[in-house]
Amino acid sequence: MDETLKRYRESIDNIDAALVFMLAERFKVTQAVGEYKATHDLPPADPGREERQISRLRQLALDANLDPDFTEKFLRFIIDEVIRHHEAAKRG
């Protein structure tokens, strides 16, 4: 394999690993949020917060030269998964 391509792929592998660990950490925190919401009888979803987050992160994507539509799709996927976890926590 070409050495340049090998270095690119190693960088991608490292970034992918970092993404997985960051997502794991994020889900630990959102799990705690879900448990808090369940014990305090709060709704699993907060549409206002979600929209503020999407708007903020779309701007970050623009600042980072990343497609904001892609970023929003990715984040909505994560948010939907978090809400599913919060709904499960509420059900017990």
What residue ranges belong to the model's regions?
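Domain-level signature for soluble enzymes in the chorismate/prephenate branch of the shikimate pathway
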Residues: M1-G92
